[in-house]
Structure formats: C-alpha cells, structure tokens
C-alpha cells in the first residue's frame, strides 16, 4: 500500500500534538518520532516527472503493459498521484499501449510454441482481454501456423524424456497452454511419426 505524504503528516501531527511539548528536545528540535516519519516520507517519491523518466527507461528495454508498468512504479515507491500522472502522460504520448503490447506478446508466445489458452491466461495477468484484441486468435494463427502444427513442433524440438512418452507429451502441451483437444491430436500425430521412423 502506498502512503500519501499529506496523509502521514496530518495523522502524525494529530497524534503528536498532545505530547509534542513533552517530547520536544532541549534544543527545540522536532520530536524523534517526527524525524522517523519524515524518513518514511522520503521513501515514497511524489515526483511525476521522475516516474515518467522511470517509464521511459523501462520501455527502452522492452514494451510493457500498463498494469506491469504500474506495479513496477509501485514497487519503486512512487505515490499513487505520481503514478497516475506519469501513466496518463505515457498513454497520451503513445509510449504505453496495451493493444500494441498484447499483439507483440501474442506473436512472441506463438513463435515460442505456446498455446492459445496459455496466452489468454498470461494476458489476464496483465489485465488484458485477449479476445478484445482485433483478429485474435485467427489472424495470429494464420501468421504463425495452426495450433496443431505448433504443438507437434514443440514436441519435436523438446521431446519428453519420461518412460510414458504419450502421457508426458500430453502434460507438456497442457502446461504450455494448448487445449486438451489440440494436445491429444498432437500427441497422436507425434507418436505415429516416431513409430514410422
């Protein structure tokens, strides 16, 4: 939970008012607990420009979703106000775009032989509805090949090493996000090809 500086100051001052005279140091400085409160305030950065700079540095490495960027800024102790302002600015500039992120994410996962179910699940983690992306999944599957071909290619590239090849291959495909029907068809085809060799 991020803490607002004004909130902390108001609540700490309100709590300290009755005892503030008794807790004043001999030299007239602030009470020790207020000094600790100011240190806590320094942990949270309320500078929207600094948060925007952080977004620029993050996006220089790779494209990110709005949700991923927000959680990174929260982890780096920016206040909600700074996060909201910097995200709004990044969206306005076109630095952040969930549709663009999702399209690249889908293509990358399909090239890595991941299944549609796994891609949908991963995009939900970014708070993106995969089916709201234009052309999903058909347009992307046309570019990368069918799910069945991708599943077979995955098994050929990284065959299971267990004794029960059929069960291990099926489990591998399910873990990689393929539907059960695609996984079972791919395993049958893959086993048949191996027996022919």
Task: Go through each PLM region and give its residues.
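An alpha-helical, amphipathic repeat domain used for nucleic-acid recognition
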Residues: 1-197
